[in-house]
Amino acid sequence: PIAITHANPAFWHPALRNKSGDVLKALGESGGMLGFSLYPHHLKDKSDCTVGSFCDMVARTADLMGVDHIGLGSDLCQDQPNSVVEWMRVGRWTKGIDYGEGSASDAGFPPMPPWFGGNLDFGNITDGLKAHGFDDADVEKVMGGNWLRFFKESFGPLN
């Protein structure tokens, strides 16, 4: 199965990396996984995105794909200098710079939303999912359980 490791639905925010409802529906139907990106350029309202908006998007995507096919794919580059993003943007064959959702005038890392400044803030997402009606079992799936199952089923022994 296919994994889209860090993107969001285009119905929520039309970033270049984000995927259409048709792609996400097919991904879920085929047993694939979507990892929700927390990179500000992929978020509705970017650095001003709220945890409520993010968790509402997760709930809408669960309705579209099924809760067993979604998880977090944070795309977190915590405490990295701008030289890291500069290195990532250089084309390996073209040697041209691809700014993706950024621009030449604003080429560095955008600030993270206040509710997710780093890996110590995953609990804010857990709390947000519960506030949006996810039960404990589904929160556990979204927060990592689905990825563990997907990896086990997709990369386990062949015999």
Predicted segments, located by residue:
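Mid-to-C-terminal alpha-helical segments outside catalytic/metal-binding sites
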Residues: A107-N159
